[in-house]
Regions:
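Alpha-helical scaffold elements adjacent to nucleotide-binding pockets in ATP/GTP-utilizing enzyme cores
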Residues: 12-15, 61-68, 112-115
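Fold-independent oxyanion-binding glycine-rich loops
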Residues: 3-5, 26-29, 44-46, 65, ...
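N-terminal small/polar loop signature for handling phosphorylated ligands or for N-terminal nucleophile
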Residues: 1-36, 41-44
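Alpha-helix capping and helix-loop boundary segments enriched in small/acidic/polar residues
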Residues: 3-7, 30, 49-57, 81-83, ...
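Short acidic, glycine/serine/threonine-rich loops at helix termini
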Residues: 11-15, 34-39, 53-55, 74, ...
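Hydrophobic helix-and-loop "lid/oligomerization" segment in the mid-to-C-terminal part
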Residues: 2, 19, 71-183
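Short alpha-helices
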Residues: 36-79, 87-94
Length: 183
């Protein structure tokens, strides 16, 4: 499953298919003349897609995919007697990815960002986001789109350029505030 790429990877998907892999492409970039032969393509900008929000970032595409998967699992009874995953807990990450990807803030993206900032300001953010804000000397209770786009985004991008991008990912997804701060 790709995230935020793959719509132009005709040869890469063909190679993965030849190796016996099943490929799903999730992307928001504009497709070329030829689409990859993936088992599934989720992209609001592909021909024939009726999803109304065409300006999603890759993180937004993946967020809506997880919402759809949860709805399908609910319909199939997968949560009978069990609690459903709280996908709202991901909105701080969705907001960060949306702003850092510099996509157009249409009504849908504005809602995603506003809800994510609301969670951050309420102290309901992932430990990695809180750690990055703290290290940058920013007050989470006053978090803004500036913080997401010009304070956190560049720090995460720098991790990939200087060292290994997985450090930034691990920081964001860490459940341990101390470990997140050390990353």
């Amino acid at each position: 499953i790709t995230v935020d790429n793959g719509i132009a990877s005709v040869d890469g998907v063909a190679a993965a298919n030849a190796a016996g892999m099943r490929v799903w492409v999730t992307d928001h970039h504009l497709p070329g003349n030829e689409l990859p032969a993936a088992e599934c393509i989720i992209n609001p900008n592909q021909p024939g897609c009726t999803f109304p929000s065409k300006n999603l970032a890759g993180v937004g595409v993946m967020f809506y995919l997880t919402l759809a998967l949860r709805a399908e699992l609910r319909k199939r009874g997968a949560f009978d007697g069990r609690s459903e995953p709280n996908l709202g807990s991901l909105l701080d990450l969705v907001a960060l990815g949306t702003v850092a990807d510099v996509v157009k803030l249409d009504d849908n993206n504005r809602r995603l960002v506003a809800q994510g900032l609301e969670r951050i300001r309420a102290g309901k953010t992932w430990p990695g986001v809180a750690a990055l804000l703290r290290i940058a000397g920013r007050d989470p209770r006053r978090a803004s789109t500036y913080d997401l786009g010009f304070v956190l985004g560049p720090r995460l991008n720098a991790a990939g350029r200087i060292d290994d991008m997985s450090r930034g990912i691990n920081c964001l997804l860490s459940d341990d505030p101390g470990a997140a701060a050390r990353m």
